[in-house]
Amino acid sequence: MARTAHIVRQTSESSIDLELNLDGTGKTNIETTVPFYNHMMTALGKHSLIDLNIVASGDTDIDAHHTVEDTAIVFGEALRQALGDKRGIRRFADATVPLDEALAKAVVDVSGRPYCVCSGEPEGFQYAMIGGHFTGSLVRHVMESIAFHAQICLHMHLIAGRDPHHIAEAEFKALARALRFAIEPDPRIQGLIPSTKGAL
């Protein structure tokens, strides 16, 4: 069964058309009208090996918040949809990723219980302007939106970092690598749900 999803979401604030394939090779085509976010979502697809096509637009004349948030919401929903009942996946994974002085660790549990903890970001990171009109605060907001709408537990911890671009990119790549292994089929439990209660 193909682990794919295609979701279109239209609101008065944004328009999102997102398609993904969990069993891809990391091919991406990303256009969100927010250049730095394009860069981050491209990295997320590339390093998770999720094929990802996104066409998004919104009221970026106000700010990038709505377009960024709604894209993350739809990505989370598509991830949840493509995973189905989660039979045969590894479920748990973690990844630690460096980018120069920045070092981020992501820990994922594809549990069906949404939770997100982000920690370690330096004071003032949330106010940093990265690549124009993408603020540091949006990184945490993206992580929370993905976690809650994919119904996964995500812990994101920044171990070290100074440059806002490097911090954001290390965190996105850490999430990507953790997702790659958490959603990967485990040949030792083919067809089984990785939970003692029999459902996720």
UniProtKB/Swiss-Prot annotation:
NCBIfam families: PRK00951.1-6 (NF002110), PRK00951.2-1 (NF002111), PRK00951.2-4 (NF002114). GO terms for molecular function: imidazoleglycerol-phosphate dehydratase activity. Signal peptide: none annotated. Pathway: Amino-acid biosynthesis; L-histidine biosynthesis; L-histidine from 5-phospho-alpha-D-ribose 1-diphosphate: step 6/9. It comes from the Bacteria. It catalyses: D-erythro-1-(imidazol-4-yl)glycerol 3-phosphate = 3-(imidazol-4-yl)-2-oxopropyl phosphate + H2O. It is an enzyme of class 4 (lyase). Transmembrane segments: none annotated. The keyword Iron does not apply. Pfam families: IGPD. This is Imidazoleglycerol-phosphate dehydratase. SUPFAM superfamilies: Ribosomal protein S5 domain 2-like. InterPro entries: IGPD_sf, ImidazoleglycerolP_deHydtase, ImidazoleglycerP_deHydtase_CS, Ribosomal_Su5_D2-typ_SF. CDD domains: IGPD. It is found in: Cytoplasm. Its EC number is 4.2.1.19. Belongs to the imidazoleglycerol-phosphate dehydratase family. Keywords: Amino-acid biosynthesis, Cytoplasm, Histidine biosynthesis, Lyase. One of its GO terms (biological process) is L-histidine biosynthetic process. Gene3D superfamilies: Imidazole glycerol phosphate dehydratase, domain 1. GO terms for cellular component: cytoplasm. Its main location: cytoplasm. The keyword rRNA-binding does not apply.
